[in-house]
Amino acid sequence: MLFRSAIMGPNSRELLQSLTDTDLSNENLPFTSVCNLEIGMATVRAHRITYVGELGWELYFPIEFSNYIAELIESIGEKFSLKLCGMHSVDSCRIEKAYRHFGHDITDEDHVLDAGLGFVVKPDKKPSKYGKFIGYDAVRKKQANGCEKRVMQFLLINPDVMLYHNEPILRNGEIIGYLSSGAYGHTLGGAVGLGYIDCEPGESEIGRASCRERG
């Protein structure tokens, strides 16, 4: 059984580099790359990706090494300003970055282009030996016809109001969509939400929109 941990933030490379001889530079390990690291007595699978929009790595290793690696990281953490964080901290950072949450912001019923994730599909790329990717025709059709809804990110001006999900999104007093997720953006100083809005195919600007406050 594997245990997963993560080191995230601007000092994450320096901290992790102090624990291994593997070169963690951007040139050697670019974004999304994976490698095995020797950290003390453990072999760790390191994936250079995070859910917070910052430099960082997700670490996978046998669960019997979980306490050992946690204590090893904690023993050197102070000089790198290491702090423990929980899921609410991660959720706050990811929504500021507009990272979608599967199950709230995207599901298997949403179109990749409506979700603003067109960069992850390459319809112009030469097909592999297995043929075109699943959903190729749907992407081409949407590209030709345009999106009728799209994900947008919202920041509340009032810093005292929270967003959760399902709040209506209004433009000129009319509901044009609902928030799919929300959290407080501590770096931005206000609640942040992601939500789908209705739009005309080819429409690129929505003007000023707002989220209706609860209560």
Question: Which residues make up each language-model segment?
Answer:
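Conserved, structured C-terminal
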Residues: F3-R212
